[in-house]
Design a protein with these regions (language model features):
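Ribokinase/PfkB-type carbohydrate-kinase core domain
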Residues: 1-25, 47-50, 68, 77-79, ...
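A general structural signal for well-ordered alpha-helical segments in protein cores
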Residues: 55-59, 84, 166
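Active-site alpha-helical elements of protease catalytic centers
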Residues: 49-73
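Short catalytic helix/loop segments, enriched in acidic residues and glycine
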Residues: 15-43
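Short amphipathic alpha-helical segments at helix-loop
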Residues: 39-43, 71-72, 154
């Protein structure tokens, strides 16, 4: 479980970093002043879209290492939009099963990845990723995934999003002698 973010990555010029008060080798949460940044990146630079977020990145690497399609599952919240569709398709192409909760009122979370001279600046807009609900995890098909899994991984960021979900998985893993990693 974690915060799924669609990375929007581009090699940029210094002017866009200055315009949005961004520093290289830094990671921040987006503020209102950053809202136009993502569209500006798309309009001004060739961009690459990558399924991201700390936990989802780790799950994708694990899936790649295991080399068995569907060996991993990622749970989180996305918006009902093109970015959510792109992220779902990217994960499926990587062999990761996704069980996203769909938030119809909030856009999919994004992370601007601005690269200059081999260094980067990250600007995360959590959006729907911040809206995951415990009730989604409790749905029979999702809880079955928890029951069937042997290992669980989540970044600590998710504790602020759905502590009940984190505690339920921790309790299940402890009661069933399974490995829960954070």
């Amino acid at each position: 479980m974690g915060n799924p973010l669609l990375d929007i990555s581009a090699v940029v010029e210094q002017d866009i970093l200055d315009k949005y008060d961004l520093q290289l080798n830094n990671a921040i949460l987006a503020e209102e002043k950053h809202n136009p940044l993502y569209k500006e990146m798309v309009d001004k630079y060739p961009v690459e879209y990558i399924a991201g977020g700390a936990t989802q990145n780790s799950i994708r690497v694990c899936q790649w290492m295991l080399k068995t399609k569907g060996a991993t599952t990622f749970i989180g919240c996305i918006g009902e939009d093109d970015f959510g569709t792109q992220m779902t398709n990217a994960c499926q192409a990587d062999g990761v099963t996704t069980k996203y909760m769909i938030d119809k009122s909030t856009p999919t979370g994004t992370c601007g990845v601005l690269v200059k001279d081999g260094e980067r600046s990250l600007i995360a807009a959590l959006n729907a990723a911040n809206n995951y609900k415990f009730e989604h995890l409790q749905e029979a098909e999702n809880w079955k995934i928890v029951e069937d899994a042997k290992f669980y991984y989540s970044a600590g960021f998710f504790l602020t999003v759905s502590p009940d979900s984190m505690m339920a998985v921790a309790k299940h893993s402890a009661e069933n002698n399974k490995c829960n990693m954070m």
